[in-house]
Amino acid sequence: METTNAKTKITVQTTVNSPVSKVWESFNAPEHIMKWNQASKDWHCPASENDLRTGGRFKHTMAAKDGSFSFDFEGEYINVIENKLIKYVLGDGRTVQVKFEGSGNQTHVIEVFDAETSNTMELQQTGWQAILDNFKGYTEAA
């Protein structure tokens, strides 16, 4: 974690044993997002919309499987470079950058996001890393 301009940045990352084109597709196609986008097995992503282009918007519904709670994770893309970079701003003004570094049949995915103030840094990092780990497992198995 690093602090820049009074905003704390948190980094999560993984290496996926798949080529960058497959990783990009799994990361961005709604039919894939709904299968991997949860931090734990008692949550799921029942809906996903994604207009992947600079100026486009996305919305992923995150919900407890028991129906007790749900929220929409949404924002607007401010930079999209196919197979390389996604940068977006969330509804609360925080920014997220996702880099894809492909090398043969492996792709390193690095997410850097502005921390929010409601949860501890450790909880945020753990939650985002769990989702990224689910993404890795799903993409490698597909």
Regions found by a protein language model. Give the residues of each.
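Beta-strand/loop substructures that line and gate deep hydrophobic ligand-binding cavities in soluble
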Residues: 85-131, 135
